[in-house]
């Protein structure tokens, strides 16, 4: 250090004081280590011997690292002191530190390899020092800041290159974290695994990089970027590019699709970086937990889980019942005043020159002294002004008994004294509060609650303070958050009026009227006003006078806040009663000169000093063997927070240093107090030389069970407590159980101290309900009978009565954390955390411990401020060791340990941490941690036992018979019968769509079938019947001529959404080919989208590709060659300029069972499936839709969705040709440039029926939600819309459809218009809300029963209920039945099972290469095992149920509604229960406003939650605990890994469905570039 060679003792006093102040700033975290060294060097520079030719500012503390040797002459004490320079010894106990080290040593043997969280590299570089507000006294210069930034960048670089987190975790995987691989299993034999290295030199976060590194082998169609047949849109929420994964082709792999993917982890080799971490996490989780499994309880009734029953071996209290303890009688002294104001009047008249108060300036020098005469005269003026000069004579603003707020800074005691006594004299009730510093102070809203509950309308303040209050731009005082409107009155002397001669204040004898109100914050942060009556105030002063033996004319040094607690009781009230001279040392002076109070004691020969442990600690730190310090005048050093169990170490350490300066051990007097009961107990000063009272050394394990056991076995978990003396004079004290009825404790039991005394608070002002429970407690004995009728007041202190009636306090109710039936004190946990060395990670004074209720128990959370210079690895090491230490010493698991950037925790007015506000920030996700460690697996031990599936002894037949006997009908439903509906339309004669088009071209050539709109809403192309027919013929000719195509060949159609696609489809039918529509690759993102195209072409064995010129160029471009082998494309035919040729003949299939087209789609589980659609199925489907939606030539419909697969393709390409209606086509990508396009089209063309996808609906809801007024102004009117159907293959998204309906209700949209369709791979259209059926109904099911594969219907609003909407009306010709997927037996009404469908438009099978029909048979042609065993059904793979409703359908029968719950393939099986990802995701998305989207999947039984963050990156870590909490609370699952990513990372297919398996593969292959990955322990 710079002071080597400097004799500190010889330095001038001012320099020594400045050095002490610096030390203090460093210890409090107000200045960085660098800033400290720089400022210190500057101070010492003039005193460094000149021979040392060294720049003092950059000398290293560690002399070994510096080549320069410096003569070391610094005094020894200083060096020793430096090591503790950053310590806050309030929580310091050498014994405790030793204990923690021992506990950690025990853990070392079983080295715990916790996986370190992964931060995005960019996030690593941002040192928390940069993104936090500078500490309040920091003045680091700019060059230092830039140096710091540079160093942060360098260290981050080093962290990456030398010791990445992985290096620390597992050195055996060195080098492997940079390579990752992905493989794809293709059904046609190309199953080789391709391994390439992904170089990590420039790991930037840009997507471009991720894409540039995708490895697609030249001869393989496996892409690291997962194909989706469907999406062309750029990276945007609506319909996004599908990102990496391995697609398995559905066909032969169908049967093993899910299990095989789970086993092989999606083809990701085990040495991927992510996999290693997850493996580690699993290993960590395999370690035995507490409690053992036998203590888990069963969740049989499925009711709410209960906390486990306590262990029979827990220690129980064994002593006799406690007897109330009486304080000494309160003596009556003849000259005690009848009221406190009378004392002031007496001294003001008889001792006017006697000093009452001395205030200090910022340097600690006396600023002014207020005499008793001045105090009396000014208080009198103020009282007169308040009562007579604020309003008019007839309408005064204030009347006696009104409440007024006192707003004075801590540095101005004089103004406060005058205001307080002025109010007492005027008989208005003062309510002292803190000075508000900003509109959003920590706890400001609660102060507003206090002012409101006390009915305060007026605030007194000083001129200086008023000027400093935050103002609005026009100069008015700001309206503080939650505050009532206040009138502000300035009380400086120049504004006060001298009372008229005849005016005298009314000073009655002290009675039970309220004298003043003191504020108190509860554990939850609620601020209430404790009302103190005039008689209580006076009695309390008398009791303190007797206990402390105050004498007239003594001097008292008060370091405490004079607005409340002991600072007010001793320093403002009792001192005036006894004509004491008070020297008030403000907080600001203490920060600047921590020794100032000691110097004041010395200078003024003070007899009493009033301090807190913090002041002892600061003074001790700043002390440098000053010659001019003598404390022998003190007869009492009152330690106001002596009730803090850790105060004993501060007292001992202070005595250690100052005993040589005249401090006598018997003068240290700890006391215990609470806002409600005021002073509870205080140690009286002992006679000189008397031995100090003995300490209690208690077992922490005993304390956690609420019993007193002297610690014998393990010194590591002991708590040493000092007494707080005897109970106050005139008081009666009991100890009662802290929860439940106030039963008296036993002698060896810890309980809450309750006090009966005339000297306590009387009520919470304005809150009678809460008052009763606190101020009117009547203790009962073990039999439950009251011990008397005197009411006691709860103190909020936990303790016991020791030998000799000494009171011991071991904690406070508000710091109590009750976890699994055991009690832990927050302060004890803080002490343990801080005893974990090295504490170079966090600031000692800035740590908050609280509990949050998650899953029916309290969970412990620790939040600390991280030093800006702490690195990731040190922080993580420290955090891991804190977990171990707390586990060893307190036997309690930590739920969450979070580090936040320096100076960001909310502060109390005097610099402490505002714990309730911190907890509030934690729970609302606004704490912004820079490091977090969650351990739910360790501490959540009350989960219900995993469900064991019992073998069902009853067969399907018995179940069915049972249902029938019970009067339950079999769960089946059907649409209208196709055969019975007479369809006179001419097209009925045509079995094939190709014939229907020819017939339409002949009979109605100019009828417009299709109109395609662009972003401006202009029709860019139209197609009449004859135009479409002619264009199809041209394409047929080209196919036969150029393509060399044979009948039955597959042809890929690669077109953007439009009319070309439709013409090419019919061109293929005319040529006898099988069309396969494929979504074209996205030109800006070929590497992600082209492999899918390639895969479909390969899997379908396409003979040629029909496409546009632009797309043909793209397929053959250099960019494409980077992703796929462009030399092996099949024949590509561009259809832009075709010659006018007609084919010789048009093909007519010999039977309607022949294939019409193939429908390929990527499922949400990443499976590519192609299904075969025959001509008869196409015909039946078009007919069914025509009848359901009443489509005929004069109708117009609008379609805004992708036309590549499923029902979307049928509506876009087939339906109009069959039914003759006009379809207005709106490509969804046009909405990106013009959001209102779809809605304005509906309005402009007065469309009655429209079809869209969820992506489109979501885009409109999010993008146009705020623009309804603008749309109205443009005359957009949706009242014409009769049905708006969302085409989907999933459970209806009720929240989205409802918000869409609500948002656009203002534009005339009928709330009944919006409905959903449901289709699957085996049947593209099962339900579609038509014109005839009843409106879709909604039911509420219990989520817990769904997990058990049961349906329990509940009322709307029931807890854990899930709303499900019917998926539209069954199409004509469709029958569904609900079947048990395992037994294949039919189920009863309202039972959950797989939906099976029978319909003439079922697909005829999966398109496979090897023709393995056995697998398909199971899905497309399967029979029930009992009941109707003849009918052939297709299995949809979706779970759902049928419920008969009260509504009537078109035929007049009761309507059977089908409710889809979700895809079987997608469900997650966890803890023996079945979960639907969407349910967990819905909960997650509600957890925080910055969660844009989420997706969940499992990996080796761990639940992984991926969350898209829409806010700033500093919010990333806020999400981790919130996501963990919500999933635990609502789904009873522990999240294993939380991954925070950028918006748009979760891949979505064209139907707007999340592709969770792609996401999973990308995550495991380390391709997501996450912002943060948290591994929950």
Curated annotation (Swiss-Prot):
Comp. bias intervals (Low complexity): 176-187
Keywords from the UniProt entry: Cell projection, Neurogenesis
Lineage: superkingdom: Eukaryota
GO biological process: negative regulation of axon extension; nervous system development; positive regulation of peptidyl-lysine acetylation
Stored InterPro entries: AMP-bd_C, AMP-bd_C_sf, AMP-dep_synth/lig_dom, ANL_N_sf, Dip2-like_dom, DMAP1-bd
Listed GO CC annotations: axon; dendrite; perikaryon
Family annotation (PANTHER family): DISCO-INTERACTING PROTEIN 2 DIP2 -RELATED, DISCO-INTERACTING PROTEIN 2 HOMOLOG B-A
Function: Negatively regulates axonal outgrowth and is essential for normal synaptic transmission. Not required for regulation of axon polarity. Promotes acetylation of alpha-tubulin.
Protein name, as recorded: Disco-interacting protein 2 homolog B-A
Species name: Danio rerio (Zebrafish)
């Amino acid at each position: 250090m710079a002071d080597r060679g400097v004799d500190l003792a010889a330095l001038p006093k001012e320099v020594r004081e400045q050095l002490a102040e610096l030390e203090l700033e460093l210890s409090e975290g107000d200045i960085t280590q660098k800033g400290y060294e720089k400022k210190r060097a500057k101070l010492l520079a003039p005193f460094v011997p000149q021979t040392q030719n060294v720049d003092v500012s950059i000398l290293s503390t560690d002399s070994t690292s510096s080549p320069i040797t410096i003569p070391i002459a610094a005094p020894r004490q200083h060096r020793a002191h430096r090591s503790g320079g950053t310590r806050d010894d309030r929580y310091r106990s050498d014994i405790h530190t030793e204990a923690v080290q021992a506990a950690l040593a025990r853990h070392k043997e079983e080295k715990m390899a916790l996986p370190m969280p992964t931060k995005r590299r960019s996030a690593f570089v941002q040192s928390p020092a940069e993104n936090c507000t500078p500490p309040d006294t920091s003045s680091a210069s700019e060059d230092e800041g830039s140096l710091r930034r540079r160093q942060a960048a360098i260290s981050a670089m080093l962290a990456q290159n030398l010791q990445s987190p992985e290096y620390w975790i597992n050195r055996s995987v060195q080098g492997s974290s940079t390579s990752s691989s992905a493989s794809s299993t293709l059904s046609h034999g190309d199953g080789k695994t391709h391994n390439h290295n992904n170089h990590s030199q420039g790991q930037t976060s840009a997507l471009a990089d991720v894409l540039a590194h995708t490895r697609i082998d030249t001869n393989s169609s496996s892409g690291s970027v997962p194909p989706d047949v469907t999406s062309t849109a750029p990276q945007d929420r609506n319909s996004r590019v599908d990102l990496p994964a391995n697609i398995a082709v559905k066909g032969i792999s169908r049967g093993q699709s899910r299990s095989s993917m789970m086993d092989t982890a999606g083809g990701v080799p085990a040495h991927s970086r992510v996999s290693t971490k997850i493996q580690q996490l699993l290993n960590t989780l395999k370690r035995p937990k507490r409690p053992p499994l036998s203590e888990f309880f069963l969740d049989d009734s499925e009711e709410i889980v209960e906390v486990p029953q306590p262990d029979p071996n827990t220690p129980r209290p064994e002593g006799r019942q406690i007897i109330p303890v009486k304080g000494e009688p309160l003596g009556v002294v003849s000259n005690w005043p009848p009221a406190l104001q009378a004392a002031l009047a007496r001294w003001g008249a008889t001792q006017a020159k006697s000093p009452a108060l001395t205030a200090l300036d910022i340097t600690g020098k006396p600023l002014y002294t207020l005499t008793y005469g001045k105090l009396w005269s000014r208080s009198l003026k103020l009282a007169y002004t308040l009562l007579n000069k604020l309003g008019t004579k007839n309408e005064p603003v204030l009347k006696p008994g009104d409440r007024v707020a006192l707003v004075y800074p801590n540095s101005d005691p004089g103004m406060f004294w005058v205001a307080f006594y002025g109010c007492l004299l005027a008989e208005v009730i003062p309510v002292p509060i803190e000075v508000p510093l900003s509109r959003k102070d920590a706890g400001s809203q609660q102060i507003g609650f206090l002012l409101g509950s006390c009915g305060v309308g007026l605030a007194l303040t000083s001129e200086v303070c008023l000027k400093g209050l935050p103002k609005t731009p026009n100069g008015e005082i700001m309206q503080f958050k939650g505050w009532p409107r206040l009138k502000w009155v300035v009380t400086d002397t120049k504004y006060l009026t001298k009372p008229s001669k005849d005016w005298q204040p009314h000073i009655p004898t002290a009675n039970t009227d309220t004298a003043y109100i003191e504020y108190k914050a509860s554990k939850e942060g609620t601020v209430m006003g404790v009302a103190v009556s005039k008689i209580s105030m006076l009695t309390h002063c008398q009791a303190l006078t007797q206990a402390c033996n105050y004498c007239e004319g003594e001097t008292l040094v008060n370091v405490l806040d004079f607005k409340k607690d002991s600072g007010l009781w001793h320093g403002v009230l009792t001192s005036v009663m006894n004509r004491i001279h008070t020297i008030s040392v403000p907080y600001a002076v203490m920060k600047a000169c921590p020794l100032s109070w000691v110097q004041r004691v010395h200078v003024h020969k003070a007899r009493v000093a009033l301090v807190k442990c913090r002041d002892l600690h600061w003074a001790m730190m700043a002390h440098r063997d000053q010659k001019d310090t003598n404390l022998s005048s003190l007869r009492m050093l009152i330690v106001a927070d002596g009730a803090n169990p850790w105060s004993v170490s501060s007292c001992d350490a202070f005595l250690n240093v100052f005993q040589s300066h005249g401090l006598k051990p018997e003068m240290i007097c700890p006391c215990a107090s609470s806002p409600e009961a005021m002073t509870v107990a205080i140690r009286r000063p002992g006679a000189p030389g008397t031995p100090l009272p003995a300490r209690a050394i208690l077992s922490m394990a005993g304390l956690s069970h609420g019993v007193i056991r002297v610690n014998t076995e393990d010194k590591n978990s002991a708590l040493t407590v000092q007494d707080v003396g005897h109970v106050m004079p005139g008081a009666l004290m009991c100890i009662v159980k802290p929860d439940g009825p106030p039963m008296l404790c036993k002698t060896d039991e810890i309980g809450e101290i309750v006090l009966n005394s005339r000297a306590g608070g009387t009520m919470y002002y304005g809150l009678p309900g809460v008052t009763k429970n606190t101020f009117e407690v009547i203790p009962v004995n073990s039999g439950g009978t009251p011990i008397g009728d005197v009411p006691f007041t709860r103190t909020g202190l936990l303790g016991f009565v020791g030998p000799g009636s000494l009171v011991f306090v071991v904690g406070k109710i508000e710091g109590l954390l009750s976890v699994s039936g055991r009690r832990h004190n927050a302060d004890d946990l803080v002490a343990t955390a801080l005893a974990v060395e090295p504490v170079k990670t966090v600031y000692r004074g800035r740590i908050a411990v609280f509990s949050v209720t998650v899953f029916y128990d309290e969970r412990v959370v620790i939040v600390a401020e991280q030093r800006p210079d702490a690195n990731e690895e040190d922080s993580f090491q420290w955090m891991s060791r804190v977990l171990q230490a707390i586990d060893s010493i307190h036997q309690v698991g930590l739920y969450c340990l979070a580090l936040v950037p320096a100076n960001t925790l909310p502060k109390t007015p005097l610099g402490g941490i505002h714990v309730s506000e911190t907890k509030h920030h934690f729970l609302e996700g606004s704490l912004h941690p820079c490091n977090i460690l969650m351990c739910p697996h360790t501490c959540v031990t009350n989960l219900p036992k995993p469900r064991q599936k019992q073998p069902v002894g009853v067969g399907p037949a018995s179940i069915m018979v049972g249902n029938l006997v019970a009067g339950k009908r079999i769960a089946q439903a059907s649409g209208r019968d196709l055969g019975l509906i007479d369809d006179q339309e001419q097209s009925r004669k045509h079995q094939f769509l190709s014939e229907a088009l020819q017939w339409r071209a002949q009979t109605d050539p100019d009828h417009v079938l299709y109109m395609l709109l662009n972003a401006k809403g202009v029709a860019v192309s139209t197609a009449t019947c004859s135009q479409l027919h002619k264009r199809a013929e041209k394409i047929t000719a080209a196919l036969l001529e150029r393509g060399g195509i044979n009948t039955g060949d597959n042809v890929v159609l690669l077109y953007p959404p439009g009319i070309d696609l439709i013409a090419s489809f019919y061109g293929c039918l005319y040529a006898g080919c099988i069309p396969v529509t494929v979504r074209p690759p996205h030109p800006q993102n070929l590497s992600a989208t082209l492999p899918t195209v390639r895969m479909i072409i390969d899997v379908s064995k396409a003979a040629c590709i029909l496409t546009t010129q632009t797309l043909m160029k793209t397929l053959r471009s250099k960019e494409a060659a980077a992703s796929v082998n462009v030399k092996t494309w099949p024949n590509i035919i561009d259809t832009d300029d075709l010659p006018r040729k007609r084919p010789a003949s048009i093909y007519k299939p010999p039977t309607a069972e022949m294939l019409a087209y193939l429908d390929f789609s990527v499922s949400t589980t990443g499976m590519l499936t192609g299904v075969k659609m025959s001509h008869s199925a196409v015909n039946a489907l078009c007919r069914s839709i025509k009848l359901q939606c009443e489509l005929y030539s004069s109708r117009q419909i609008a379609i805004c969705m992708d036309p590549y697969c499923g029902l979307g393709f049928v509506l876009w390409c087939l339906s109009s040709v069959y039914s003759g209606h006009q379809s207005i086509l709106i490509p969804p990508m046009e909405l990106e440039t013009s959001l209102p396009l779809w809605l304005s089209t509906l309005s402009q063309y007065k469309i009655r029926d429209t079809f869209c996808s969820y992506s489109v609906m979501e885009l409109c809801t999010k993008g146009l939600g705020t623009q309804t007024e603008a749309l109205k102004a443009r005359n957009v009117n949706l009242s014409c819309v009769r049905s708006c159907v969302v085409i989907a293959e999933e459970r209806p998204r009720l929240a989205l459809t409802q918000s869409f309906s609500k948002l656009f209700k203002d534009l005339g949209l009928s709330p009944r218009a919006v409905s959903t369709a449901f289709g699957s791979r085996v049947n593209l259209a099962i339900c579609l809300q038509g014109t005839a059926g009843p409106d879709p109904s909604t039911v509420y099911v219990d989520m817990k029963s769904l997990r058990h594969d049961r349906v329990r219907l509940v009322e709307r609003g029931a807890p854990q209920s899930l709303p499900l909407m019917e998926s539209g009306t069954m199409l004509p010709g469709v029958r569904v039945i609900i079947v048990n997927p395992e037994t294949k037996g039919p189920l009863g009404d309202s039972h959950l099972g797989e939906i099976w469908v029978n319909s003439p438009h079922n697909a005829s099978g999966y398109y496979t290469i090897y023709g393995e029909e056995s697998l398909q048979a199971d899905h497309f042609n399967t029979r029930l095992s009992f009941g109707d065993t003849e009918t052939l059904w297709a299995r949809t793979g979706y779970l759902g149920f049928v419920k008969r409703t009260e509504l009537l359908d078109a035929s007049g029968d009761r309507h059977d509604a089908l409710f889809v719950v979700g895809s079987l393939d997608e469900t997650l099986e966890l803890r023996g229960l079945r979960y639907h990802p969407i349910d967990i995701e819905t909960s997650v998305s509600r957890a925080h406003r910055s969660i844009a989207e989420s997706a969940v999947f499992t990996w080796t039984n761990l639940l992984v939650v991926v969350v898209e963050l829409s806010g700033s990156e500093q919010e990333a870590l806020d999400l981790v605990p919130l996501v963990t909490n919500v999933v635990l609370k609502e789904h009873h699952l522990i999240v294993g890994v939380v991954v925070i990513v950028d918006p748009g990372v979760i891949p979505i297919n064209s139907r707007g469905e999340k592709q969770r398996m792609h996401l999973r593969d990308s995550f495991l292959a380390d391709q997501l570039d996450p912002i943060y990955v948290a591994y929950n322990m």
